[in-house]
Amino acid sequence: MAFLLDTNVLSELRKGVKADAKVRQWAARTLGQRHFVSVISLGEIRKGIERLRPKDPLQAAMIERWLDTLRQNFGDHVLPFTDDVADCWGRIIAKTPLAVSDSLIAATALTHGLTVATRNVADFIPCGVPVLNPFG
């Protein structure tokens, strides 16, 4: 099985040994499987960095370094926004009122035949995308 990691899973895994035990166990169990990330999640992380920067520039810089590492580690497993994803997104959003970022992540997963790993299962179920909650 292959997974598209939602932003909340990426953020949790960033905590390392302090991350939720169930998420750490899930990540260890699925290590040999294919994990992907959407450019939409990278954009959400960037938004968080920029909102944090005026209040806590040191923390923002730390998260920015993590984001750079994340991009490098995922390499070609960072999935772009493509024409196919745009078409799928249009079909989703026409029928289901969702947050733009969630619907774009769902469209990316559907286009690539991936299961979304997320804490926010209820946000993705209306899209018809397979979901898994690694938080339990």
Spans of model-derived segments:
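A generic structural signal for short hydrophobic patches within well-formed alpha-helices
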Residues: 10, 42-45, 86, 124
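Aromatic- and histidine-enriched alpha-helix N-cap/loop-to-helix transition segments
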Residues: 37-40, 104
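Acidic, PIN/NYN-like endoribonuclease modules and their adjacent C-terminal/linker elements
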Residues: 1, 106, 110-136
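General small-molecule cofactor/ligand-binding pocket signal
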Residues: 36, 79, 132
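Short, well-structured N-terminal submotif of metal-dependent ribonuclease cores
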Residues: 1-38, 51-69, 136
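Active-site neighborhoods of divalent-metal-dependent phosphate/nucleic-acid chemistry enzymes
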Residues: 47-53, 61, 72-117
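Residues at the C-termini of beta-strands that transition into short coil/loop
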Residues: 39-40, 82, 120, 135
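Acidic active-site catalytic centers that drive phospho-/nucleotidyl reactions
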Residues: 6, 44, 102, 120-123
